[in-house]
Amino acid sequence: MILLIDNYDSFTYNLYQYFGTFTNDIKVVRNDKITIEEIEKMNPEKIVLSPGPKAPKDAGICMEVVKHFMDKKPILGICLGHQCIGEALGGTVSYAKAIFHGKQSKIEHDGTGIFQGIPSPIKVARYHSLAVQNEDLPNCLKVIAKTADGEIMAMQHKEYPVIGLQFHPESIYTEHGKRIIENFVNTF
């Protein structure tokens, strides 16, 4: 079962539909309606932290989920979920170099893991004004995709299957978005 933690975002059910293409066992729970103990009892195979408004400190249980489950379950964070991973592991989240709401950017990626079989560069959909800051990226994380101006668009834990995507793979404006989701489902 994939647990999709909803950060009160309008894109959550787009993600649900994309994941539903590859698995029929998905449970959606709001970020303030579940505890670590309840997640342990559910015993999900994977955890997804959805996009959402505001900042990581406002994302309910998400940062606690990263800290508790990072060495136990594959975790994918998208947009706010990505920022939660960065901050939970010691990074800094602050204003992005530019505000991107409903805009497309070209990114370069490393072609491994979640990007396996996907050409580089690709165009992705961005809806954010905050970003994980490159200069404060914890040593346990590596950048696996970025924009031409160096903004982090994807990062991965060096030891555990914890991946953050600043962009929205579930948006029609993201090239190969379904393949990115499929790679997470099948690779991690």
Language model: regions and residue ranges:
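Acyltransferase
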Residues: 171-188
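Cysteine-nucleophile active-site neighborhood
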Residues: 44-117, 181-183
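Histidine-centered divalent metal-coordination motifs
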Residues: 79, 128, 168
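Short hydrophobic/Thr-rich beta-strand motif most characteristic of the beta2 strand and flanking loop
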Residues: 25-31
